[in-house]
């Protein structure tokens, strides 16, 4: 398989929509030192689809998904989120960021604010919601992720898994069309991983469009519509979970899986 064939966006399965919410075409990115971290990556993500991105350290996977909300700029190619081009127009970038939620390895919660205030801050300032509406939605979301009883505590009083669930609720409070997850369980103790993955599973069942950088193979097998392998700044292979894990086409994919399975 050639690189261009490997990177040709695949059509979604019948279970997801036909509307592409994310359209990335031939995306290139260089760092200031000249390092080419993304080398012409193309990927479509469809409404309601869950795409898991895997790859070794330094493969460009986290950088790639961070271009989807302009946390990382790119120099060539194009990225559209729900029809809005991410370019240099600050209004377009702000519009995209309102529609794209992101959860990181670290929780990035404000330590001096309660859980409830962490979740309501952005909707009040960015969406201009009144306090009562923001708090009502926040409590509903905290209940959804299983920590409504922690609403008046501070982040430092919570476990890592609880803090990550607050971070997910905070992103959902903006009512995004897309959720990005950048290795959301990698900083957690093993016994806390499941509670975060359960929240992500429920989001997928509810039809949230999701792009997840993770090496949680069980989650990918169960929840993903497609699994993508990146290495060296290129998309090596993308396929259904069954084909990706049981019958990978590329030698690089086979070698990678031999190290994590």
Q: What do these predicted ranges mean?
A:
Residues 1-16, 253:
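Pre-NBD coupling/linker segments of ABC/ABC-like ATPases
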Residues 2, 6-9, 104, 149, ...:
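Intrinsically disordered, low-complexity regions enriched in polar/acidic and amide residues
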Residues 2-3, 229-231, 238, 242-261:
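C-terminal boundary and immediately downstream tail of ABC-type ATPase nucleotide-binding domains
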Residues 17-241:
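ABC family nucleotide-binding domain
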């Amino acid at each position: 398989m050639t690189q261009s064939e490997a990177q040709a966006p695949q059509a979604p399965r019948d279970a997801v929509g036909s509307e592409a919410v994310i359209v990335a075409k031939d995306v290139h990115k260089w760092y200031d030192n000249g390092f080419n971290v993304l080398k012409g990556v193309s990927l479509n993500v469809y409404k309601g689809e869950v795409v898991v991105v895997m790859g070794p350290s330094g493969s460009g996977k986290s950088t790639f998904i961070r271009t989807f909300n302009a946390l990382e700029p790119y120099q060539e190619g194009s990225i559209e989120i729900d029809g809005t081009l991410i370019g240099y127009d600050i209004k377009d970038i702000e519009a995209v960021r309102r529609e794209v939620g992101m959860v990181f390895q670290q929780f990035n919660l404000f330590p001096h604010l309660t859980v409830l205030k962490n979740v309501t801050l952005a909707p009040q300032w960015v969406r201009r919601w009144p306090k009562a509406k923001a708090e009502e939605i926040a409590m509903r979301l905290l209940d959804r992720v299983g920590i409504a009883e922690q609403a008046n505590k501070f982040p430092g009083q919570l476990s890592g898994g609880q803090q990550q669930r607050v971070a997910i609720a905070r992103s959902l409070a903006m009512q995004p069309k897309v959720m990005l997850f950048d290795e959301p369980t990698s900083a957690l103790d093993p016994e806390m991983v499941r509670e975060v993955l359960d929240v992500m599973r429920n989001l997928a069942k509810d039809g949230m469009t999701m792009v997840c950088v993770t090496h949680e193979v069980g989650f990918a097998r169960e929840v993903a519509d497609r699994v993508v392998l990146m290495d060296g700044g290129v998309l090596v292979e993308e396929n259904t979970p069954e084909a990706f894990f049981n019958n990978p086409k590329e030698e690089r994919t086979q070698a990678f899986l031999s190290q994590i399975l």
